[in-house]
Amino acid sequence: MSSFVIEGGHELRGEIIPQGAKNEALQVICATLLSSEKITINNIPNILDVNNLIDLLQDMGVKICKLGDNSYSFEAKEINLDYFQSQDFHSKSSFLRGSVMLVGPLVGRFGRAVVAKPGGDKIGRRRLDTHFIGIQKLGANFIYDAQNRAYQIEGKNLRGCYMLLDEASVTGTANIIMAAVLATGTTTIYNAACEPYIQQLCKMLNSMGAKIKGIASNLLTIEGVSELHGCVHQILPDMIEIGSFIGMAAITNSEITIKNVSYENLGMIPDSFRKLGIQLFVKDDDIIIPKQTSYTIESYMDGSIMTIADAPWPGLSPDLLSVMLVVATKAQGSVLIHQKMFESRLFFVDKLIDMGAQIILCDPHRATIIGLGERFKLRSAVMSSPDIRAGIALLIAAMGAEGTSIIHNIDQIDRGYENIDERINRLGGKITRQE
């Protein structure tokens, strides 16, 4: 099991370019199954989850060519549908939560699919109902194979329909869109997720010949077409990594510039950090975080404690709350972090408490952080990364701590962050990877 050894207290300086967006990459790579023609995707992040999905598509028969460090072409002309019944497919797909998004394009184009119960972060209940109910409404049948812990899906003649999603699930919306673009007739999806990565998926599909209207809204109308063609697609920068870099700069009292952030697609992220007292400025399409010796959490106008909570787009992504929680430990003032979507994502705070942070875990969804200001330094610690987002939060905490910390199980961090140790070290950090 690999580990990071982090020497805390090093100031960062310089420029950094964010990786391509993990969540968009998983969606658009799955979408390449919808066409037999060549599709080129640029700015694909070199991370475990994405690389595992690429390997899985290759095993399915997709011809994949690496064109550059972060560019690939995909040609899904001949797919081995029998491979879905193999133990190899079940094993690989069960360890990758993004594999659930194979269902939409496979049923849409081939009329059948198999998906093992997918893995991913252990951050509480993450139901698949939205995916399955939406695709069922298009005419697919789902049968659960208890022996193999897999779903067998049949849907030879999908037909468009109206559907109201009971939650604005991002991956659920993506899956339904990919199933609907080749269905007969018109599909209307109300309460659809509308975050930038869904917008990107829709734009890519339209460039392939799909007919999707209402992009960037929660009401999508999809007129089915008979076939889709090739295209060239550029993945957006990863908003979660951008937020992570802001957190690193804040907790290490550093000045850094984050380049080419696609600022208009960051939503509430910059303002949420400003609520914690973090200064940041926008120049062209770059974010500049100046060196701050201290920062103070804002209060509401009536003087009550600030609450920062996740919400569907354009609200704050739940993936950044762990980072914001760590940043708040060094602030002046108090804040309530409310993680609405997942009930186990705050359980890593016990590790921060061991490092000296003042945190009250109110319940599985809420934590109050009492910032102790610049005079306070976290203590170094030995810990293990429980998931991607808690892992990067613990890494940020270790960078701001006194002494040398060790984080085990860093495969969790590698699942979502590209060569993060090397990139931080180029800014002045001191992180050693131990295999």
Where do the PLM segments sit?
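Short, structured segments at the rim of ligand-binding sites
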Residues: 1-435
